[in-house]
């Protein structure tokens, strides 16, 4: 019997009538200043979509039969109409998964969430201890996230996720993350560090080493059966047998995934917020559905893609050349190997002088930190301690 998987992949590559995974950043306002923030969040954009405009988008998603939307930011819960929009979405058959640092997940909010259908909550943690996490996310952010997990567990909220960006500093804590998730009845989700947003400045110091990539792969194969990874780690697939890692081994940008930002701009990928990947705007280009179906960028991405320099590699069918955003923001050709290619094929290009594209906009608060990263820490310190007033 022929496996349906290749046919499904072919459909994904040609693009679907609606995205499977739609990320919507409701606001750039944030109470934290994480060093790797992919959207360089901090300050609210004055052109942020209004409540009415957001509801119009939700109406459109309902007509397109979008299953659910990933809501992020920034910190989405600081937007005054956040809960109104969540209620509106679920009432219009659009499920919501939102990512939060936990700042607004009080016992009362947790109780409300536990009584709500079609809402999924994801708490961001980048260290299994305060020492590791707070060096990335800011002083007090670990305790804040754990407090949110405690509140959700006490309220009986089922299915909370702990979302971890894997870095050089926390890859050794994988077992501890799993223990933490078990303690609060949570599912562990791990994602890849991308060199986008503020991550552009710290990627070289924070992305896992080659040995750590192998360590991560081995852990996922042996212990990661119930760990969510999405499409984060298909670049690791050549380390083992085909199919050993769960997840989608293709770039879904503009085919099955995309992003709407706070002002209504639509990008091909949540990790590629740059003019090069801007497909249109929901306000000025006839709505989201028109952008999704008719954008010239999305049409181009849905055409058969050349394997380029990776075509002669025997592992191409496993990794498909890796992550488009990771290549773009490290100044590598889009038809070449991933900067973290486990076969080492990107090393010659990384050794050469490259132009590193800058993010489209920086919403950070205060002056950017540009001094060299201390080698003893292998990272840039957070810009400021946790502050619950983001606006």
From Swiss-Prot:
Gene Ontology CC: plasma membrane
Binding site for [4Fe-4S] cluster 2: 251, 258, 269, 323
InterPro entries in the cross-refs: 4Fe4S-binding_SPASM_dom, Aldolase_TIM, Cmo-like_SPASM_containing, Elp3/MiaA/NifB-like_rSAM, MftC, PqqE-like, Radical_SAM_PqqE_MftC-like, rSAM
Keywords: 4Fe-4S, Iron, Iron-sulfur, Lyase, Metal-binding, Oxidoreductase, S-adenosyl-L-methionine
Domain annotation Radical SAM core: ranges: 16-232
Binding note for cofactor: Binds 3 [4Fe-4S] clusters. One cluster is coordinated with 3 cysteines and an exchangeable S-adenosyl-L-methionine. All three [Fe-S] clusters are required for MftC modification of MftA.
Binding site for [4Fe-4S] cluster 1: 30, 34, 37
Enzyme Commission number, as recorded: 4.1.99.26, 1.3.98.7
Record PANTHER family: PQQA PEPTIDE CYCLASE, RADICAL SAM DOMAIN PROTEIN
Sequence similarity: Belongs to the radical SAM superfamily. MftC family.
NCBIfam families assigned to the protein according to its UniProt record, in alphabetical order: mycofact_rSAM (TIGR03962), rSAM_more_4Fe4S (TIGR04085)
Name of this chain's protein: Mycofactocin maturase MftC
Record gene name: mftC
């Amino acid at each position: 019997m022929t496996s349906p998987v290749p046919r499904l992949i072919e459909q994904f590559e040609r693009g679907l009538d609606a995205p499977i995974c739609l990320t919507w950043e409701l606001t750039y306002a944030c109470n934290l200043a994480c060093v790797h923030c992919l959207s360089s969040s901090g300050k609210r954009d004055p052109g942020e979509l209004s409540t009415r405009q957001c509801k119009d988008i939700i109406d459109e998603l309902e007509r397109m039969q979008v299953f659910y939307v990933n809501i992020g930011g920034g910190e989405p819960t600081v937007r005054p109409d956040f809960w109104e929009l969540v209620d509106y979405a679920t009432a219009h058959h659009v499920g919501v998964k939102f990512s939060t640092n936990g700042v607004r997940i009080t016992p009362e909010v947790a109780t409300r969430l536990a009584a709500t259908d079609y809402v999924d909550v994801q708490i961001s943690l980048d260290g299994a201890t305060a020492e590791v996490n707070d060096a990335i996310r800011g002083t007090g952010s670990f305790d804040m996230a754990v407090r949110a997990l405690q509140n959700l567990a006490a309220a009986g909220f089922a299915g909370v996720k702990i979302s971890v960006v894997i870095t050089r500093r926390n890859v050794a804590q994988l077992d501890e993350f799993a223990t933490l998730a078990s303690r609060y009845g949570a599912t562990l989700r791990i994602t890849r560090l991308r060199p986008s947003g503020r991550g552009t400045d710290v990627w070289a110091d924070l992305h896992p080493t080659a040995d750590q990539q192998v360590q991560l792969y081995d852990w996922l194969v042996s212990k990661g059966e119930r760990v969510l990874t999405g499409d984060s780690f298909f670049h690791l697939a050549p380390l083992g047998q085909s199919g050993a890692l769960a997840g989608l081994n293709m770039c879904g940008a503009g085919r099955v995934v995309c992003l709407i930002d706070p002002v209504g701009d639509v990008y091909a990928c949540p990790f590629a917020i740059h003019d090069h990947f801007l497909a249109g705007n929901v306000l000025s280009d006839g709505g989201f559905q028109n952008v999704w179906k008719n954008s010239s960028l999305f049409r181009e991405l849905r055409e058969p893609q050349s394997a380029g320099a990776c075509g002669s590699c025997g592992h191409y069918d496993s990794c498909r050349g890796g992550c488009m955003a990771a290549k773009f923001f490290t100044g590598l050709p889009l038809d070449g190997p991933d900067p973290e290619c486990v076969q080492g094929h990107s090393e010659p290009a990384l050794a050469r002088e490259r132009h590193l594209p800058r993010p489209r906009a920086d919403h950070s608060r205060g002056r950017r930190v540009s001094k060299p990263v201390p080698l003893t820490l292998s990272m840039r310190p957070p810009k400021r301690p946790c502050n619950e007033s983001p606006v």
